[in-house]
Design a protein with these regions (language model features):
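Extracytoplasmic loops and strand-loop junctions of Gram-negative outer membrane beta-barrel proteins
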Residues: 97-101, 128-133, 172-175, 224-227, ...
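Transmembrane beta-strands of outer-membrane beta-barrel pores
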Residues: 121-127, 153-157, 164-170, 216-220, ...
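Surface-exposed loop and membrane-interface regions of Gram-negative outer-membrane beta-barrel proteins
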Residues: 125-143, 153-210, 225-228, 341-346, ...
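Signature for the C-terminal beta-barrel architecture of outer-membrane proteins
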Residues: 189, 194-209, 225-386, 444, ...
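Outer-membrane beta-barrel "beta-signal"
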Residues: 58, 76, 511-527
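Extracellular/periplasmic loop regions
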Residues: 66-84, 91-93, 338-341, 348-462, ...
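N-terminal periplasmic/intermembrane-space "pro-region" immediately following the signal or transit peptide
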Residues: 2, 6, 13-138, 148-150, ...
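Outer-membrane beta-barrel and related beta-rich outer-membrane complex signature
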Residues: 129-131, 174-176, 226, 269, ...
Length: 527
């Protein structure tokens, strides 16, 4: 633990020093009047160009973390966050193409049909996986196939979507679970009423539509921390209910609201919705000032009945605010969120909170466009198991990565500082890596995923400590062809005192840490 703290101090100092050096570089002058005049003229020209671009409806997008540098769509207020791995899946999903735009001459008139087909295979080497209830080495192979068909425009205002998924895990030592296994399942089947110009237009001439959807849906929102379909995981979060959206991503404002019931993934049967639970919410997007900041106030709620005394009765309310953008005149980006939760949870009062802070700097003058960032996340845990107030944060249906590359963590009872570096040495190659530390927010609450999520993952006395461990990770993503992407990754985890103590208490043995290596290949039918 002492070594971990020393490393954190060293990395934090390096990050601040890099920022200071860049700042000094920006303010050093030679004292030459001519050079100062030239700089002022250049800045004036840049400002005029920026204003001209805005009036023409062209907004430049900052470098997307872990993604190629690209301009935003012409005529859009939308700016993509630079923060690491916080970008929701597109709608429709990324592997889907409009047939008329595939370049296949036979399909050039099928503007009304969206289709997609992809397959992913991932080999994993998991040595001493913390999530398991025994210490061993496993070599699972995970397979996932998806197919999508969407009908648009030709039947407007009616639109239709069907998406299929088949997810399986082979060659593993552990029983099937619904994280990895969901055979022959429809993950989306919904109808949509789409009214293109129902709310007029924004200042850039973009139509402000109304969309009303009903049926089974899978989607991601905000930074994916509370609502995501878990692209890394083999199976997909999805829901049944309704969703209403006012506006679109290109507009200066947009409102998205829903009322849903979670779909329970069943291994040997067709999935079905959880009739005893409702998940609802609304998200506002304010993009009028998106060249500096995008604001996303939102609310999420969960209502669950006791199902005849067989489960906890819950009523949880969660107001929140997210703000992301780039500091004017710099390449320093930020992504800030705060969430508060209140209500009733199994007869107890609910009082939980979380906040997420990320600051980064992109070196645009370098050809590889490296970005270095610092992140800190705090998610509350239950402070006192004997008190009638529950402080454990409700994570709703968010993603687990990139809390850790090992997929060990969920947003619950955690303090997590991180330092990351991302760069793109080639058009088709992206690389990122980082150093991460993890502590319990409350040492009397649980580490959710430890030991298969069972009783050994909590010490109500707090005597097992609060340090979970630290990790280093590295990942490379390479576009082999226009249809094939390959990803190789490695993570080394070092056990902290809490993990060692709980493994000893539960298993009678422990290890110094764990290793996780994987190779993933994704194949899409269309470019």
């Amino acid at each position: 633990m002492k070594h971990a703290r020393f490393i954190w101090i060293l990395l934090a100092n390096s990050f601040l020093t890099a920022g200071s050096v860049q700042a000094e570089k920006n303010i050093i002058t030679t004292g030459s009047t001519d050079q100062t005049t030239q700089q002022n003229m250049l800045q004036t020209a840049q400002n005029q160009l920026t204003n001209t671009g805005r009036s023409a409806g062209v907004i430049h997008t900052p470098t997307a973390a872990g993604n190629p540098v690209q301009d935003a769509k012409p005529g859009t207020f939308y700016q993509r966050a630079r923060s690491y791995s916080t970008h929701p899946e597109t709608d429709p999903p990324r592997y889907v193409r409009n047939l008329a735009k595939t370049g296949i001459d036979a399909f050039k008139d099928l503007y009304w049909l969206d289709v997609g087909l992809d397959h992913r295979v991932r080999y994993e080497l998991r040595n001493n996986d913390l999530r398991r209830d025994r210490i061993t080495t496993d070599h699972p192979v995970l397979l996932r196939t998806r197919a999508y068909v969407g009908i648009r425009e030709i039947l407007d205002p009616l639109r239709l979507v069907v998406e299929f998924e088949d997810a399986r895990r082979y060659h593993g030592k552990f029983p099937k679970d619904n994280r990895d296994w969901n055979e022959f399942e429809l993950i989306q089947t919904y109808g949509e009423l789409y009214f293109r110009g129902a709310l007029g237009q924004d200042d850039l001439g973009n139509h402000r539509p109304i969309r009303i959807r009903g049926g089974r849906m899978a989607w991601e929102a905000l930074d994916r921390r509370l609502l995501g379909n878990n692209q890394w995981r083999n199976t997909t979060n999805n829901f049944e209910g309704f969703r209403v959206t006012l506006g679109q991503e290109a507009n200066d404002w947009e409102i998205d609201g829903w009322g849903m019931q979670l779909v329970i993934r069943l291994i040997d049967e067709f999935d079905r919705r959880n009739k005893s639970q409702w998940f609802y919410g609304a998200i506002g997007h304010w993009r009028k000032w998106s060249e500096v900041v995008t604001l996303q106030p939102y609310y999420m709620g969960l209502m669950q009945d006791d199902k005849g005394g067989t489960q906890a009765k819950r009523e949880i309310h969660s107001p929140a605010l997210r703000a992301y953008g780039v500091l004017p005149g710099t390449e320093i980006d930020f992504d800030l969120s705060t969430v508060y939760q209140f209500g009733r949870d199994n007869g107890q009062k609910k009082a939980a909170w979380a906040y997420f802070l990320e600051f980064g700097h992109t070196f645009q003058q370098l050809s590889w466009k490296p970005r270095i960032s610092a992140f800190y996340g705090f998610v509350s845990g239950d402070r006192d198991p004997n008190y009638n107030v529950n402080n454990r944060f409700e994570r709703f249906f968010g993603f687990a990565r990139p809390w850790s590359a090992d997929d060990y963590f969920v947003p619950e009872n955690i303090k997590a500082p991180k330092i990351r570096l991302e760069f793109q040495p080639h058009t088709d190659l992206r690389i990122d890596g980082g150093y991460n530390g993890f502590w319990l927010a409350s040492k009397t609450d649980r580490f959710n995923n430890l030991l298969n999520g069972r009783g050994g993952n909590r010490d109500r006395t707090g005597n097992s400590g609060d340090f979970l461990g630290h990790a280093i990770d590295l990942r490379a993503i390479y576009k082999l062809t226009s249809h094939v992407n390959a990803t190789v990754g490695y993570s080394r985890w070092f056990n902290g005192e809490f993990v060692k103590n709980r493994q000893l208490a539960t298993l009678g043995e422990t290890a110094s840490g764990s290793n996780f290596f994987y190779v993933e290949v994704s194949v899409s039918a269309f470019k």
